[in-house]
Structure formats: C-alpha cells, structure tokens
Amino acid sequence: MWKYLHRSVKNEGTVERLTNLNLFTNHRFKFYSTLKEQSFWRIPFKRRSKLQKWVLSTGIVSFIAFNIWWVYWPHHTFPKPVAKILRKGLHSEIKKEGANYQKSLEYYLEALEECKAENVDLLSDEYTGIEIKIGEMYEKLHMYNDATALYGDMLKKFYNELSKTTDKSTKRKFFLLKRDLQILVRFNEINKDSETNATLLIMHLLLAQREFLENSPEFKNVLSKSELLNNQQLDWKNFKGLPFIGKSKPDYQMHLNSKRKQELKIKEPESEQCVFMKELLTARDLYTRYCLNRSNLSGALNSKITTLEWMLLADSPLDDILLAQAELGSIFYLNSEKFEGSLYAIDNEPYKKSEPLELIRSRLQENQNSCLQYSADCYKSIISFANENQYPKVAMESEMDQRILKALSLAHYGIGVINLHKGRLRASKKELKKAIRISEMIRFNELIEEAQRELKKVDGTPI
C-alpha cells in the first residue's frame, strides 16, 4: 500500500514488468518466424513506408508512456486529498537531509482527519495503515504513552468487530485478524503494564486461534492433544519427548533434512487460513515469554510445545523451527531445575503434606529426569541435523544459515550445561567450546559470555 505513494521507480515492480516484457518479446519473435512476417522486420528503416514508420513510432511512444504511467503514477485506493497529504508525510520521513518525524506525524494526523471526512472505513487497510504510521512516528519520537493509547484503541476497535456474530467473508475476517495481531505485538513491546499486556494478549490470542482452527481441521487434531493456553501440570507418563510433533525421532530428522535439501522455488500464494499464521505464532511466543516472566514454567512449556507443533504443520522456515526447538530445550531444562528445587525442599525442610513423602519424592524425581532428558533430546536433534548437513562447514552468509548456526550454538551450549549438571566435566567443556567457536562465527556475543561463565565453573572443578 505505502510503496505506491512514492513518486520514484519501484525496483521490484520494474523487474517484474521487464520480465514480462522479455516473455512477450520472445513470443513475438516466435510468432513472426515465418518468412513473410520476417520480411517486414528486416526492411531497413529508411526504406519503410510512412505508414510503417508511423506504426512503429506510435507503438514505441505508447509503450514508453505506459511504462512511465505504471512506474511513476501512484496506484492506491486512497482518496486524492488523502494521498496528497500522505506523500508529504513520506517525503518528510525519508528526505536526504534528515528525517523530520514531527512533521511527518503532523501530516499523517491530517491525513487521518481527511479520511474521516471522506468516510473511509475505520477498519480498512488504508485507515488502519495510517494509524500504524502515526504509531511508528510516536515511537520514533519516544512518545510511548501516545503510541500505547493509539494501539490500545485500535485493539479495542478490532476486538469489538471480530467478536460480533455478523457474517463476514473469510478473507475480510482473516485480514482483520492479521492486522489485530500485528497491533497486539506492537502494543506488548512498548507497553510497560505487564498485567494489561497479559490480559489483552490472552483475549486476542484466543479469539484469533478460535477463528483459525475453525478453518484448519488439521490443527484441530493437535488441539485435541494439548490445550492452547493450559497452565496445568503435563502428564509426564504420556509425554514422549520429541514425538510431540507427531513423528518419531527418525521421521523428524528426515523432515528437517528434507526442508534443508528442498530446492528454492517460487513461493505459492498463501492459503486463506495461513494469511496471519506468522502473526499468530509471534503472539504465541509473546504468551510463552509472559509465562516465563511470571515463573509459570508449566504454562510456558505447554505453550511452546503447541507452538512448535503448529510451526511444523504450517511448514514454517527451517531456521525458525530449529530456533524454536532450541528454546523448547531451554524451557525443559528450566522445568527440570524447578523439580530439582522441590526435591531439595523435601530433603531439607519439613514437609506437611498428608500424601506419603516417598511417593511425592519419586514423582518429582521422575519429572525432573524426564525434563532433563527431553531437553537433551531437543538439543541433540539440532546437532544431529547439523552434522548430517555438514554445518557449520557449509554455512553461508545468508540470514537463514546464520540463524541455523545460532540454533546450533544454543544446542551445544545446552548440552554443555546438562553435562556440567551431571558432572560430566570433560564432555561439558568440549560442548561449551564448540558453542563459543560457532558463536564467534556469527558474533553471538551474549552466548559467548554465558558459555565462558560456564567454562569457568568447569575449570574450577577438579576433573
């Protein structure tokens, strides 16, 4: 939408049009392949008739005029008065001598008022797009209270509309959900009130998930196995580690490798139900982070497991899946520490529960061991994938490869910490050094510091 407001050449569109032109030209030469048709094109220009000259000249001029119109004229659905104001705002935002965000903000606010005067739909792409631009200017000017208020009003507007029982087309409903989740993420990132964030996050996330699942039967099967936002204790006896994705370990490794080896191809248009999948997964990650901040480790674990299942079903990019799995391994490890803390409390403090102490202790020990094993499984699966695909040796400078290396460094670090926890000092040192070496390749400085801190613990302990 916004790209058409610039009066400058659009590289992407130009490339596409040139590609189409080449295709047209190729077909044209094929079409004129007969001797009769070729004779026309082979006539020297000076020998052509006036009519031929006129036809060729007119065609060339028309072609140039069309391309100038297509490239430079703004193709958007804003009313003309609104578009005129928006151009001024964009110019102030990107001019070479320095962006004037305050001036841009004034223009965008003026454009919003003009939209109201033109009776533009308050939930349309155009109207909400201007509101988002206003929010961006507020953030760039460090006017976070104003940005928070704006996003909060937008969330209320979208929630009220999406909660209505009136019939809407699936396409429009999914557009509203996509926009709603985009604003929800922005609101959560700048608002300091964690309780408000949590309330709105759960409200909007549940609404989006309900609508999504109604149109995605394959995801309902996953839902039947684990709740969307379930804070209850997992049933550890029925929990099988890596097969939470619905596959055995070998099948999962095959799935990862097939994703890596698949050839690059033109992306097919998104199906309707996947239009807002990226925003939905981002919102779920926000909920996981909220659970971690509240020390609700069971809630965080359940949330992350379900999110990873959804990522696999939605065929998310490989690097996203591996990073999500590394995070899941960390959450499993945190849960193991929680159970270990409970065991320590039983052994060192009076316990007042009526249930036999040994039975409680046995259950906690089982849970602690299970979490530690599942954590190691997550990390080892990433390392196994990397070894089979010769990482980090084959890694390029691409963003995907850099993110895969990040997941790999986290996996080696995680295994190193687990080995240290179990007293396997030599193995721990080896894994931590690998984590540091890979982190240095991608300048993952935070992990380098953490791994070096763990190495000091290893070096300070007699082997």
Swiss-Prot record:
TPR repeats lie at residues 84-118, 128-161, 358-389, 409-442. The chain crosses the membrane at residues 54-74. It is a single-pass membrane protein. Its main location: membrane. The keyword Repeat applies. It is found in: Membrane. Keywords: Membrane, Repeat, TPR repeat, Transmembrane, Transmembrane helix. The keyword Nucleotide-binding does not apply. GO terms for cellular component: i-AAA complex; mitochondrion. It comes from the Eukaryota. One of its GO terms (biological process) is protein quality control for misfolded or incompletely synthesized proteins. GO terms for molecular function: misfolded protein binding. Belongs to the MGR3 family. This is Protein MRG3-like. It comes from Saccharomyces cerevisiae (strain ATCC 204508 / S288c).
